[in-house]
Every structure is written in C-alpha cells, then in structure tokens.
C-alpha cells in the first residue's frame, strides 16, 4: 500500500464526492456520507498523511482507489 501525501481539505472533499459521498454538514469539520458510511474531514491545510489514511479507511476505500479520484 502506497502512502498518501498531505493534501488540502477541499481536494479531499472533491475526491470523496467523486467516490459517491455527499456533504451532510459543515463547521470546523466537514461531515460526509454515502448512505452507508460517515466520514469526518478536518478543515485545515494540509491534512496530514496519517489522518488522511484514516479518513480513506473510514470511507471504505483503498489508498489506490482514493488516489484515482484525486
């Protein structure tokens, strides 16, 4: 499994939208859902690689699948 770079939170939101997630609510964090899973994305830049890896795992995607949506 390859590593994820630290990325901008807006890029992460766009990638998850391509994966079928929709924004549920926004505040200091953005909460997204695909009707099965709930994912929370912090609003700071860049999102560290370790945190981004957890978000991708929570979304039920592999790193390679997520990178394809970037």
Model-based region annotation:
Residues 1-70:
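Basic nucleic-acid-binding interfaces
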């Amino acid at each position: 499994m390859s590593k994820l770079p630290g990325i901008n939170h807006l890029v992460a939101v766009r990638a998850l939208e391509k994966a079928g997630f929709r924004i549920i609510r926004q505040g200091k964090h953005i909460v997204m859902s695909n009707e099965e899973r709930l994912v929370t994305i912090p609003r700071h830049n860049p999102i560290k690689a370790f945190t981004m890896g957890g978000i991708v795992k929570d979304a039920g995607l592999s790193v390679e699948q997520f990178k394809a949506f970037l």
